[in-house]
Swiss-Prot record:
InterPro entries referenced in this protein's UniProt entry, alphabetically: HSF_DNA-bd (IPR000232), Vert_HSTF_C (IPR010542), WH-like_DNA-bd_sf (IPR036388), WH_DNA-bd_sf (IPR036390)
SUPFAM superfamilies (UniProt xref): Winged helix' DNA-binding domain (SSF46785)
Bias kind Polar residues: ranges: 317-331
UniProt feature, compositional bias: Basic and acidic residues: 289-314
Disordered: annotated span: 275-333, 464-491
Organism: Gallus gallus (Chicken)
Region of interest (D domain), residue spans: 208-229
Protein's recorded name: Heat shock factor protein 1
Region (Hydrophobic repeat HR-C): 346-371
Gene Ontology BP annotations: cellular response to cadmium ion; cellular response to gamma radiation; cellular response to heat; DNA repair; MAPK cascade; mRNA processing; mRNA transport; negative regulation of double-strand break repair via nonhomologous end joining
Region of interest (Transactivation domain), ranges: 333-491
One cellular component (GO) term of this entry: kinetochore
Length: 491
């Protein structure tokens, strides 16, 4: 069985078969063998060969020349060397041909031309060209991918930087929040302490009350204020005993000063505040008339000073005291004890003032003396500024009043003790607001914001050498006669 195959291989290698493959040599021998013509043989033209009955050919012929009996492997090897199957027209129909005939042909596989077998080469796939094309495509793709990767990398780096910045900002914000929480806690503690302090003040004020500071004379504030609290007794006391006349005044209760029907918010009111009692020069005028009087505010006479606003705006009052004197005693230094009075005491005091005014009117009408009241009202009017006051116009009237009072005291020296309540009169002007005299314990007399009239207790309000010494109204305040004034203006 192996004789024909080996012989064919030797034959193929003999005539130059060194360049011809063993498959081609075996195929040439197989086709040339006359014993295999019923299964494989040349075509009539000699350009191709036919294979009949592929099954029988695979079983009987292929094992003799090849190591297999698979027809499919034989056909695949033919295709590898460039043999192509020839298809006839009758074989392309739907009807299966009666005869199993397969024809293969190759340009260099021709009958009688064995030397052409050298030209038959086994097909080699062009891997290099395919690889080159693939490499080009891959390089383009790789370049594009690299570009895209670089872009994505740049974006990623920017996002990373933004995330890092946001992280730092977040940490800073958290630190700030922590510090703010600590500050808020501290501030809350401070606020709580302040609230507790204010609550304690309010509670203590409800129990003890707060004394209100009251501005006195020469205050131009016209705003109305509430009544001060806590009633005290009101008294006028003499400090020095150089005057032969001791001005005695009973301690008035709060009901005697103001009454409900008194016009505290309307025009000026002239009322009697003190009563002058004639006493011997040896009498001691420095004694206190009321042992229960509140602490004393000393009033002294000083030169006029620039007006200073009080710490709190409260009703302004103007007071003028007219004293009765026939001689020229030494100026009396008066101490003013002030208290905040209740409603009943104010009413009683106002009743006393009304009665004193009636007595004064009766006294003036009895002696046929007339006083220019309009000038006095203008003098003490709250709407009139101190620079508009013309005190020399009132010289005659005030001097006449002083002479009249002096003459009455000389005519009735024996009735001084019996009628002590009707002899001496002191004029006090009440404006639209009620008169409140301030306690020295509640008001800082030495403060720069209080009016000058609080300091009258230390000396004369009008100093020596000043042009105000010639004002007769000053004699009423000091208890001494003064010459005619030149032309002063009150500041």
């Amino acid at each position: 069985m192996e004789g024909p195959g080996a012989a064919a291989a030797a034959v193929g290698a003999g005539p130059g078969g060194s360049n011809v493959s063993a498959f081609l040599t075996k195929l040439w021998t197989l086709v040339e063998d006359p014993e295999t013509d019923p299964l494989i043989c040349w075509s009539p033209s000699g350009n191709s060969f036919h294979v009949f009955d592929q099954g029988q050919f695979a079983k009987e012929v292929l094992p003799k020349y090849f190591k297999h009996n698979n027809m499919a492997s034989f056909v695949r090897q033919l295709n590898m060397y460039g043999f192509r199957k020839v298809v006839h027209i009758e074989q392309g129909g739907l009807v299966k041909p009666e005869k199993d005939d397969t024809e293969f042909q190759h340009p260099y596989f021709i009958r009688g031309q064995e030397h052409l077998l050298e030209n038959i080469k086994r097909k080699v796939t062009s891997v290099s060209s395919i690889k080159n094309e693939d490499i080009k495509v891959r390089q383009d793709n790789v370049t594009k991918l690299l570009t895209d990767i670089q872009v994505m990398k740049g974006k990623q780096e920017s996002m990373d930087s933004k995330l890092i910045a946001m992280k730092h900002e977040n940490e800073a914000l958290w630190r700030e929040v922590a510090s703010l929480r600590q500050k808020h806690a501290q501030q809350q503690k401070v606020v709580n302490k302040l609230i507790q302090f204010l609550i304690s003040l309010v509670q203590s004020n409800r129990i003890l009350g707060v004394k209100r500071k009251i501005p006195l004379m020469l205050n131009d504030s016209s705003s109305a204020h509430s009544m001060p609290k806590y009633s005290r007794q009101y008294s006028l006391e003499h400090v020095h005993g150089s005057s032969p006349y001791a001005a005695s005044s009973p301690a008035y209760s709060g009901s005697n000063i103001y009454s409900p029907d008194s016009s505290t918010n309307s025009g000026p009111i002239i009322s009697d505040v003190t009563e002058l009692a004639q006493s011997s020069p040896s009498a001691s005028p420095s004694g206190s008339l009321d042992e229960r009087s509140s602490p004393v505010v000393r009033i002294k006479e000083e030169p006029p000073s620039p007006s200073r606003s009080p710490k709190e705006n409260e009703p302004s009052t103007t007071t003028a005291a007219a004293g009765n004197s026939t001689e020229q005693p030494q100026p009396q230094e008066k101490c003013l004890s002030v208290a905040c009075l209740d409603k009943n005491e104010l009413n009683d005091h106002l009743d006393t003032i009304d009665s004193n005014l009636d007595n004064l009117q009766t006294m003036l009408s009895t002696h046929g003396f007339s006083v220019d009241t309009t000038a006095l009202l203008d003098l003490f009017s709250p709407s009139m500024t101190v620079t508009d006051m013309n005190l020399p116009d009132l010289d005659s009237s005030l001097a006449s009043i002083q002479d009249l009072l002096s003459s009455q005291e000389q005519q009735k020296p024996s009735e001084a003790d019996a009628a002590a309540a009707d002899t001496g009169k002191q004029l006090v002007h009440y404006t639209a607001q009620p008169l409140f005299l301030v306690d020295s314990s509640a008001v800082d007399v030495g403060s720069g914001d209080l009016p000058i009239f609080f300091e009258l207790g230390e000396g004369s309000y009008f100093t020596d050498g000043d042009e105000y010494n010639e004002d007769p109204t000053i004699s009423l305040l000091s208890g001494t006669e003064q010459p005619k004034p030149k032309d002063p203006t009150v500041s």
